[in-house]
């Protein structure tokens, strides 16, 4: 699944970056070639997080972006049950798509200035909504949504 999420994140990042360039011109000096998917991690205070940074190699500066998602999304995707109240609402598929859009908005805003990538202002909220609407049109999201109906219990019976 990690390859899937890295693919989804980068395909959306590149496509949406192209949309913004057509809209505003190529004014994004801190673009990254890729966004690393840092995996799923347990957290009690975030759905997702974005790490922004830069690496200096001689006179070259490489800007880095990495997205992490809460492990509870993976549990929910896998059909695991939880005693957490409203677990599927809090970590279900719709919230996962919203969280990916939210973190991608941080990455896209950081293309202009790294500090902008940490903001939660009106422009971040609007960009998150736009990216989320875009995500729902992608075949990658439609396929993952289809797989939500997959009978994991049947698969697990055949595992050794």
Enumerate the language-model features and the residues they cover.
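A short, surface-exposed helix-loop junction/capping segment
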Residues: 1-3, 103, 109, 149-155
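Charge-rich, solvent-exposed alpha-helical interaction surfaces
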Residues: 7-11, 15, 19, 103, ...
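Conserved aromatic-histidine-acidic binding/catalytic patches
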Residues: 4, 88, 92, 96, ...
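N-terminal low-structure segments adjacent to metalloprotease catalytic domains
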Residues: 1-7, 76, 95, 160
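Post-HExxH zinc-binding segment in Zn-dependent metallohydrolases
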Residues: 114-159
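Active-site scaffold of zinc-dependent metalloenzymes
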Residues: 41-94, 107-111, 123-129
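Short alpha-helical catalytic segment bearing the HExxH-like zincin motif
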Residues: 95-103
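A metal-dependent hydrolase signature that marks the N-terminal structural subdomain at the beginning
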Residues: 1-62, 89
